[in-house]
Amino acid sequence: MHVKKDDIVVVISGKDKGKKGKILHAIPKKERIIVEGVNMVTKHQKPTQQSQQGGIIKQEAAIHVSNVLLWDKKANQGVRAGHKVLENGEKVRVSKKTGEVLD
């Protein structure tokens, strides 16, 4: 996957197109991610022993990783990410548009 936990991403398709958020959780096997404040769903929760409160709660649902782009602070927009190996052998992600290191 071209993104990982704690990256800032922008949604490029779907009902939340244009929203920006931080990745809370990544699910590599299913190629899905959970982004803060994106794809909110309503869930009816029963009271349990651990959490006494029940009721209707809103929480983030997973979206496919192809629906997001990494956010480049310098370019102030979403960019595609590529990989590059530096002279010291370190592998980093770079912006395909500007060539700047994103990590």
Swiss-Prot record:
Q: What does this protein do?
A: One of two assembly initiator proteins, it binds directly to the 5'-end of the 23S rRNA, where it nucleates assembly of the 50S subunit.
Q: Gene name on record?
A: rplX
Q: Which parts form a coiled-coil structure per UniProt?
A: none
Name-wise, this protein is Large ribosomal subunit protein uL24
Q: Name one GO biological process term.
A: translation
Query: What organism does the UniProt record list as the source?
Result: Alkaliphilus metalliredigens (strain QYMF)
Q: What keywords appear on the UniProt entry? A: Ribonucleoprotein, Ribosomal protein, RNA-binding, rRNA-binding
**What InterPro entries does its record include?**
KOW, Rib_uL2_dom2, Ribosomal_uL24, Ribosomal_uL24_CS, Ribosomal_uL24_KOW, Translation_prot_SH3-like_sf
State any GO CC term. ribonucleoprotein complex
Is the Ribonucleoprotein keyword given for this protein?
Answer: yes
